[in-house]
């Protein structure tokens, strides 16, 4: 920005790239997430279990909607929370800009596309950050669902919904001589319970709810830390970030306390979501900072007098005028002396 006027940049590829590239990629990610979540296009791996295994014999906690952290609440939080935070942050940044001395050079340009479309820096930042967040949210869903489909790890209440016939499977009941399980069941028809409940009970690792919460919290906390400017206090931003981390931690605790997931499932979900958010913030949106403007090429019809000039190295480092060096390397004074003539 020079003289109070924003830097303008003309681009005819921003709208086609957004419509035909980024929107298409986002649609593919959404479609794949839907296929993994709500269809049987990718069947869940059938993993065996030990007879009377206490790790999978917890009571059935009921449907997911009856949980203290139901999926509807989690989806609403991971969608509305980061969106409102980023929206408020960008509005505050646009209407109350920081002084140049306390913030890096923005370098954002107002992009003009065609004769009518003009994209200001606040609008571009808002679309960029929310678009990348949406892409990462569905990517996290894909990673979590793919892990559940491939591994097929049972939940802690798996045997309660499976209801296997141990007598028909040849599983003797535990006794003092055999305190632990001694037979591993791999028969796919061993479960007599509801097929839908059994299929849902085979999708424990990693915990999808924990992954989504960790992704949303990490992305939002990094935005608060890197974008928000608070003067006179060092505890405001850490307090906000810890307040954001608390619900995600509580979701993991609820999943374990209700026997819906193991601790290992929750931890794997936390790591998956946090890793995806960290990658997107660091490598895609560049820590929510704008790249400095690096200049542009002059068009052929522009005046060459506007081109940047370069100083000559001879002007920067002039040769000393006091002494010169002989061609054989012996120095001698630069002032010429007239030889004496014998008379």
UniProtKB/Swiss-Prot annotation:
UniProt feature, compositional bias: Basic residues: 322-335
Keywords: Glycoprotein, Membrane, Phosphoprotein, Transmembrane, Transmembrane helix
GO terms for cellular component: plasma membrane
Molecular function terms, GO-annotated: phosphatidate phosphatase activity
Modification Phosphoserine occurs at: 299, 312
Positions annotated with a glycan in the UniProt record: 165
Segments traversing the membrane: 12-32, 72-92, 129-149, 210-230, 239-259, 266-286
Topology within the bilayer: Multi-pass membrane protein
Any one Gene Ontology BP term: phospholipid metabolic process
Span list, region Disordered: 291-343
Transferase recorded as keyword: no
Transmembrane helix among keywords: yes
Places the protein is found: Membrane
Recorded family membership: Belongs to the PA-phosphatase related phosphoesterase family.
Name of the protein in question: Phospholipid phosphatase-related protein type 2
Gene it is expressed from: Plppr2
């Amino acid at each position: 920005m020079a003289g109070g006027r924003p830097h303008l940049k003309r681009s005819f590829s921003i709208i086609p790239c957004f419509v035909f590239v980024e929107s298409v990629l986002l649609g593919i990610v959404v479609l794949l997430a839907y296929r993994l979540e709500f269809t049987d296009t990718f069947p869940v791996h059938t993993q065996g279990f030990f007879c009377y295994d206490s790790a999978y014999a917890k009571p059935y906690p009921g449907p997911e909607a009856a949980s203290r952290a139901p999926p509807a609440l989690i989806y609403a939080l991971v969608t509305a929370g980061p969106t409102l935070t980023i929206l408020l942050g960008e509005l505050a940044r646009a209407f109350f800009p920081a002084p140049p001395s306390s913030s890096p050079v923005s370098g954002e340009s107002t992009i003009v596309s065609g004769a009518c479309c003009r994209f200001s820096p606040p609008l571009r930042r808002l679309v960029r950050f929310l678009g990348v967040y949406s892409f990462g949210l569905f990517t996290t869903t894909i990673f979590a669902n793919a892990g559940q489909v491939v591994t097929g790890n049972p939940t802690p209440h798996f045997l309660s919904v499976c209801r296997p016939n141990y007598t028909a499977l040849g599983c003797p009941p535990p006794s003092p001589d055999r305190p632990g399980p001694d037979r591993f069941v791999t028969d796919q028809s061993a479960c007599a319970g509801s097929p839908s409940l059994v299929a849902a009970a085979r999708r424990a690792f990693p915990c999808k709810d924990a992954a989504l919460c960790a992704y949303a919290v990490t992305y939002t906390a990094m935005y608060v830390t890197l974008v928000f400017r608070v003067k006179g206090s060092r505890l405001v931003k850490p307090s906000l970030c810890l307040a954001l981390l608390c619900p995600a931690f509580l979701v993991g605790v609820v999943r374990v306390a209700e026997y819906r997931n193991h601790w290992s499932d929750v931890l794997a979900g936390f790591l998956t979501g946090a890793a995806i958010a960290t990658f997107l913030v660091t490598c895609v949106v560049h820590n929510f900072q704008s790249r400095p403007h690096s200049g542009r090429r002059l068009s052929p019809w522009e005046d060459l007098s506007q081109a940047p000039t370069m100083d000559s190295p001879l002007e920067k480092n002039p040769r000393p005028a006091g002494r010169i060096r002989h061609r054989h390397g012996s120095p001698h004074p630069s002032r010429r002396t007239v030889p004496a003539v014998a008379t």
